[in-house]
Amino acid sequence: MSILSVKNLEKKFGDLTVLKDISFNINDGEIISIIGSSGSGKSTLLRCMNQLETITSGTITIDGKTLVETKNGTPVYAGKDVLKEILMETGFVFQNFNLFPHYSVLRNVMEAPVCVAGVPKKQAEKKARELLKKLGLETKADAYPCELSGGQSQRVSIARALALEPKILFFDEPTSALDPELTGEVLKVIKSLTDLNITMVIVTHEMAFAKE
């Protein structure tokens, strides 16, 4: 069953067309890699599917809910409640981590469940600690982002994305900001997530990893 559907997607920045007539379906539980040359619109496509960029035209459906569709040549987005539902069903791992620098690792992972989903703090903390343990970060719960290595920061970013128990996880070049020796560390973590049966869409330049 298709959990993510994109139809005739177009995205322009002014007169520059970045995405043109993009259509595809991704089934529940699939792991898909998006590869292409730098500047080809891979990250923009991911951002369009995750409500971080508005589209120019087309239709995006996530888990049976229409995120956006084109009516009379204009993209029309779903209402606030549906957008929130979709947001809580998707997680996004950024190139540059995007952690809150003034929050501890634990609070970074807890923040969305508590503030967006309304999960009680004790429950959110329990889940956050479980995720940090799974990703080998249980000893870093009270540390701050400035005290972490790049690989550790990216693992915290992955834990944060998993905290809302999303159905789809988007990775935008998850190793691009890392030193070469840390790349394997993060790729190993991503591979370990396959047992969670989460649909994953990964933008990457790591061709060997994409093949796996």
What do these predicted ranges mean?
Residues Y144-L148, Q152:
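Conserved ABC ATPase signature
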Residues T204-H205:
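H-loop/switch region of ABC-family ATPase nucleotide-binding domains
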Residues A163-K167:
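A short, proline-enriched helix->beta-strand linker immediately N-terminal to the Walker B motif
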Residues I35-S37:
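The feature captures the beta-strand-to-loop junction immediately N-terminal to the Walker
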Residues L169-D172:
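Catalytic Walker B motif of ABC-type/P-loop ATPase nucleotide-binding domains
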Residues P180-L182:
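Helix N-cap at the start of a conserved alpha-helix in ABC-type nucleotide-binding domains
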